[in-house]
C-alpha cells in the first residue's frame, strides 16, 4: 500500500518543506518536497503510527491502517513549537542528511535571511548570498553575481518557475525578491541535475509562498533606504482545508532623496543616484487533497544616474501560472509552469551613443514524478521561446545591431536510487537549439555514500550548454549595462577560423564530504570543485574594422575548495 499527502503549517496553511515523514518503528520514511508533498510506497498491509518531525514544529503522530494495493491521502497540519529538539527530530534530520545528495547546493529559508545583520535594517537575499562559499558579488558596482567562476549570464534565475534576467538592483544591496514573501531559495553552485538547463554555471531557484489561507495580515516597514507594504490572506475558505489565498508585495526606494540628508559625506551632486520599485502579486487556489493552481505577476524597475549627464535603467515584468495535480489512485505527481517575462535595459551617456537591449521569453514546462519506496523517478518536457535585441555603437563608431528569435526545447529524466548506505541520482537532458539546428546530449550524475552515520562522501558532475550571451565582457567588473543576445550568426576562434558549434559549453566535477560532530550540533561540509568552460562566447573588445568579428570564442577553468 501507499500513504501520501501534504504537510501544512496549521496557522497559515502554507506547505512545510523538507520535513521528515515516517512510519514509526520501520525504515519507511521520506522528506517532504518544495510543495510539502510526501509519498511512502511499497508498505506492507497493517496498522502503523505516522510521524512527522521538524525543527520548527511540534511532532505529529497519527495511527493509520494501510491496505494492500490501496492509497491513503493525508492532510497533515503542524503546530509551531518552541520546545527544544528531541531525539525524534534529530533522527529526522539525520535521515534527510543521509538520503539527500546535497552536492553544491545551499537551501535558504526566509528566517535565515532575517536573522542576519542587514544594511538599513532591511534583510535581503542580495546581502545574504554574499556570505555563501563560492560566491563573488560586485555589490554597488551593478550587483553582478559570479558563482564558482561563472559569469552572471551563466546563472539560471527562476522566480516561481519564470525566467528572470536580472535579480539585483544597481546599488547591489537589494534583490528584486521581498524576503517577507519568500518560501524557499535553492542555490546550485554547480553540478545541478538534468531538470535544469540552458545555463552553464549555476542556478538560483526562488519560490514564493501562497499567502495565509486562514486570516488576513499585513506589514508596513520603512528605513532610510526603502519602504514596503506586504498583504496576504484568504479569498475563499473551505472547511476541509482547501481554499483560495493571495499575497501582494510592493516596495519603493528613496535613497536618491534621503542620501542628501543621511549621507551628506557622499561626494556626488545629488546624493546617491539610485532608485527602484518592485511589485509582486500571486493568487493560489488549493483543493482539500492538495492539488493547486497559482497565477502571479511582477513588475520590477531600476534607475541610476551615473553622473549629471548620464542615465541608466531597466524594467522587468512577467506573468505566469503553475499547477500541481495529484491524480486519485496513482502514485505520481504532475506539475507544470507557463509564463512570459521581459527585460529591457538602456543607458544614455554624454560621451557615447545610446545603448539598449531587450530580451523576452515564453517558457513552458511539464513534470511527472513517480515514487517507488524511497526512490524517485522524474521526467519532463520544457520549452523556451525568446527574442533578443541589442543596439550599440563601438568607440570606433561602428554600429552593432543584433535582433534574433530563438526556440529551445528539452526533455529530461532522472532517477534517484536510495539504498541503506548510498544514494545515486543519474540524469540525462536532451537540449535542442532549434535556431541552430543543434541537439545537445547532456549527462549529469550525483551521489552520496554514507560511510558512517556521521560521515558521508558525495560527488556530482555533468555537461552543460547555453545559447544566451551577455554583451558585457567578463573583464568589465564595473559596468552596469549588459545587453543580451543569442549565439551570433557568425563566430570565429582565435585563429579567425569559423566555428560551427555556436553554443557555450561547460563541464563540472565536484566531490566532498559531510561530517557531523558533537551529536549533530556541528556540521562540516567541504567541497573541492572544478568547472571547465570548454567554450565561452564573449564580445570582441578589440574590434576595430567593420569586418572584424563582433564576438570571439574563449576557454577557461575555475577551481577551488568551499568550506561551510
Over which residues does each language-model region extend?
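Membrane-embedded beta-barrel scaffold of Gram-negative outer-membrane proteins
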Residues: 338-339, 493, 499-553, 557
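Periplasmic N-terminal accessory/gating domains of Gram-negative outer-membrane beta-barrel systems
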Residues: 58, 65-70, 91, 95-153, ...
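Transmembrane beta-barrel strands of outer-membrane/channel proteins
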Residues: 218-224, 248-254, 295-299, 336-342, ...
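Surface-exposed extracellular loop regions of Gram-negative outer-membrane beta-barrel proteins
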Residues: 199, 250-254, 292, 331-350, ...
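Transmembrane beta-barrel wall of Gram-negative outer-membrane proteins
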Residues: 225-254, 265-303, 311-335, 370-377
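Outer-membrane beta-barrel transmembrane domain signature of Gram-negative proteins
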Residues: 313-320, 327, 344-347, 353-423, ...
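Short strand-turn segments of transmembrane beta-barrel domains in outer membranes
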Residues: 172-175, 183-193, 203-234, 248-252, ...
